[in-house]
Amino acid sequence: SVIIWSVGNENADTDERLKFMSVLAECAHREDETRMVSAACLVNATKNKIEDRLMEYLDIIGINEYCGWYTPDFAMLPALMENSQPDKPVIVTEFGADALPHHHGTISDKGTEECQADVYEKQIATLRNIDYIKGMTPWILYDFRCPRRTSLIQKYYNRKGLLSEDKKYRKPAFYVLQKFYEELKRKEQ
């Protein structure tokens, strides 16, 4: 089911982009009044703040962030959330970390299942306490081929999946997220 229309993902902030994507957002609102409109908006790295001119045309602000993976300092995430304080709901539209299935080590060893699970635990612990965060979507459900990913861990795959590429093996991060969703379900009952 489609629950939200998205008009973009991490597009550079130019006048042309704003004009085009604001028209897309207005068109989505006009054509389907039953669904909200979103986009993965930009973060101002200097201010560590969600800051995007497109936000005024959206119902929900999306952000992609990879604290603990591309951004090693996890302290950046609570600061980003504190600095932002938008007047609209936010969904974290991408987050995660690579893990080669069955590759083990410590939480500090990138590419291990332990590191990926730790990133998920820290994300959840941080995001669950921020009132304006209304959802999060991990990147991604299962590993997939990606010719640009040539490292020894990735081996031509994007390994951020919660499942292996054959969809048969559930990585530990899958269970971290499952536990969180079960807690949310119990709270709602």
Predicted regions: what they are:
Residues 3-5, 18-30, 35-43, 53-189:
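Substrate-binding clefts and catalytic carboxylate motifs of secreted carbohydrate-active enzymes
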Residues 10-13, 67-69:
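Short histidine/acidic/glycine/proline-rich micro-motifs that form metal-
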Residues 48-49:
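Switch/coupling sub-region of P-loop NTPases
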